[in-house]
């Protein structure tokens, strides 16, 4: 695997009244295989638009995306998506949900069962495998969503606010699980989040996007994800660089939000 290259990506949405919105402008980014990237920014900066283009759900106005030497032109099995809401088949059991992708690909039953059992062990759901999804808590449903994504063995996992709806304790446990799965599988992960703390804990790299038009404003290389694989995340937060970096990024995003609100008031 050679990784993902995003080259001069722009996205323009045409509005019914003839106006347009420039959601992204000349975004370029290279991710090596196995990298974990966190993406932050104020609402409307194009984070989810960028993720949807990488997923192949949207075609960019200009620019290109190259994954493992091939141009991305639409959705395919090389990229898996985990949403804020699990997007699971609620009438199916946990096992059936995780097995869905391999079943659609015609994976032999012996191989499929081995994969599903392994992933259920990894995410701690082996004892719940016959439960219907609707019987599970939100945190458990997100564990199913992660396992289902991994069952398809994508090269890149795209995560759009996957932990945003969880309570604080469950969210911390899921953050630890994401780091564990990242290290065990070697997958490339792009994580969209509104939480500065979460972005710092989970990202080897972190980009802050600015709005109007959406673009990369600043990039950081971080030590915290590697530390969090083997340590309690609460201990990682005590790292001397963590607090100052958190404050720096929070202030940066607050300044952007104030500029947006100021622009709205001027327009009014």
UniProtKB/Swiss-Prot annotation:
CDD domains: ABC_NrtD_SsuB_transporters (cd03293). GO terms for cellular component: plasma membrane. It comes from the Bacteria. SMART domains: AAA. Its EC number is 7.6.2.7. Residues 4-236 form the ABC transporter domain. ATP binds at residues 41-48. It catalyses: taurine(out) + ATP + H2O = taurine(in) + ADP + phosphate + H(+). GO terms for molecular function: ABC-type taurine transporter transporter activity; ATP binding; ATP hydrolysis activity. Keywords: ATP-binding, Cell inner membrane, Cell membrane, Membrane, Nucleotide-binding, Translocase, Transport. It is found in: Cell inner membrane. Belongs to the ABC transporter superfamily. Taurine importer (TC 3.A.1.17.1) family. The complex is composed of two ATP-binding proteins (TauB), two transmembrane proteins (TauC) and a solute-binding protein (TauA). Part of the ABC transporter complex TauABC involved in taurine import. Responsible for energy coupling to the transport system. This is Taurine import ATP-binding protein TauB. It comes from Roseobacter denitrificans (strain ATCC 33942 / OCh 114) (Erythrobacter sp. (strain OCh 114)).
């Amino acid at each position: 695997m050679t990784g993902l290259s995003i080259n001069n990506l722009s996205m323009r949405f045409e509005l019914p009244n003839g106006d347009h919105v420039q959601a992204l402008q000349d975004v370029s980014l290279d991710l090596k295989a196995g990298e974990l990237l966190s993406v932050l920014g104020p609402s409307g900066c194009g984070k989810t638009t960028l993720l949807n283009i990488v997923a192949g759900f949207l075609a960019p106005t200009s620019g290109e995306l190259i994954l493992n030497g091939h141009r991305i032109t639409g959705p395919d099995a090389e990229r898996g998506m985990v949403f804020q809401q699990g997007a699971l088949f609620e009438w199916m059991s946990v096992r059936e949900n995780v097995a869905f992708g391999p079943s659609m690909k015609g994976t032999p039953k012996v191989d499929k069962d081995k994969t599903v059992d392994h992933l259920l062990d990894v995410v701690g759901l082996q004892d719940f495998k016959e439960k219907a999804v609707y019987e599970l808590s939100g945190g458990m449903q997100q564990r199913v969503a992660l396992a289902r994504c991994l069952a398809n063995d994508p090269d890149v996992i795209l995560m759009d606010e996957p932990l945003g709806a969880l309570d604080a304790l469950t969210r911390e446990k899921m953050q630890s699980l994401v780091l564990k799965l990242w290290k065990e599988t070697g997958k490339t992960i792009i994580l969209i989040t509104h939480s500065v703390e979460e972005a710092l804990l989970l990202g080897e790299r972190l980009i802050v996007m600015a709005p109007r038009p959406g673009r990369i404003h600043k990039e950081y290389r971080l030590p915290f994800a590697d530390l969090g694989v083997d340590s309690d995340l609460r201990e990682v937060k005590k790292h001397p660089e963590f607090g100052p970096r958190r404050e720096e990024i929070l202030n940066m995003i607050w300044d952007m939000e104030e500029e947006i609100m100021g622009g709205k008031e001027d327009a009014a």
